[in-house]
Every structure is written in structure tokens, then in C-alpha cells.
Amino acid sequence: MASISAYGRESPLSHKTGYDWVAQAFSGIMHMTGDRDGPPLPVGIGIADVSSGVHAFSAIGYALFHRSRTGVGQWLDISMVDSMFHMHDVSLQGFTLTKGKFKPFRQGNHHELIAPFGVFKGPSGYICILSLQPQWKNICEALGQPDLEHNPRYADGPSRGENQGELIEIIEKWMTSFPDNDAVLE
């Protein structure tokens, strides 16, 4: 037997009705979605509904395997809120491991620690660019500014993160020199 509910059968909130957006809000996913200074936003798709179904599918597979080995069935209790917790990257873990000293926040279109790592305005829409240290040299060369690679303001990940606003301007200005997004991506 498998069941999916907002909070789980044995939760103190098991008698409450819940929907996708409620699970997103209750789990903190909405707190992490949206612009830094804006309100919390839901993810644009029914992620709690879908993720809970995927969790149930996976759990059913393991339960059937367990039953084939032991002859014992199980009751699988899938909570929509619980299925959202694995969606957090460092936000939940960072808060927990630092006993609340790390305060996760909405990042908007750019990662708060890594740059360039975000959604940039291109000439005919938006382009997602993600670059870690191994790719930084290639980004600088593509920008036509190889000197940025060793500029202390951008030489390593933490420096680029601290100077992210300037770096976003450099990249978006460069993108305007192309006729469209396809040309940027070539």
C-alpha cells in the first residue's frame, strides 16, 4: 500500500489539506525562489505533486523488491512536504550545520556564491551561463578580455562572487554585440 498526502499519515498536520504550493511554502522552497528583495515565489511547475509521485514510484519499486525477498509487504507513506526537502541544495544543510548562522536567501537569477552562474539578458532573450574555475579562462577568452582571468577582482570564485554585479554587466554588455542569442552561443 502506498499513500501520498501533504504532511504524511502520522504528522500532527495529517488532518490538514495541502496542495503543491502549500508543500512548496511549508518546506521553504518558496523562501528560496524569487528575486533577492522580492517576495517568495512558487516554482513555476507542480514540483511537489510530481516529485511526490516520483518518490512513491521509487519507494514502491524498493518495497516490491523487499517483498520478493522477505514475503513481507509495507505501507509507504509519502509526504509532499518531505519530498521537497531533498530539493534544497546548501540552504537547508548550511542552516542546520551552522546552527542557524548561515541564513539562506532568495538568489534571483544568479547564484549567491559562484559567478558567472546565472541567467543573463542576451540580445534576443535570456541565456543561462554557468562557469566554475576550470571554465573561467574560456569565458574570459570568449568575452575578448583574457586579462580578466588574472584580475584580482575576478581571479577566483569568491572574488567573482563578491564582484558579481560588475561581472554581470561585463557579460551582458558583451552579449549586446551579437545580433541574437544563437550568435552568442556559437
Task: Label each PLM-derived region with a short phrase.
Residues 1-127:
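Active-site-adjacent "lid/gating" segments in soluble enzymes
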Residues 108, 116-186:
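Aromatic-enriched alpha-helical interface/lid elements that frame and gate functional surfaces
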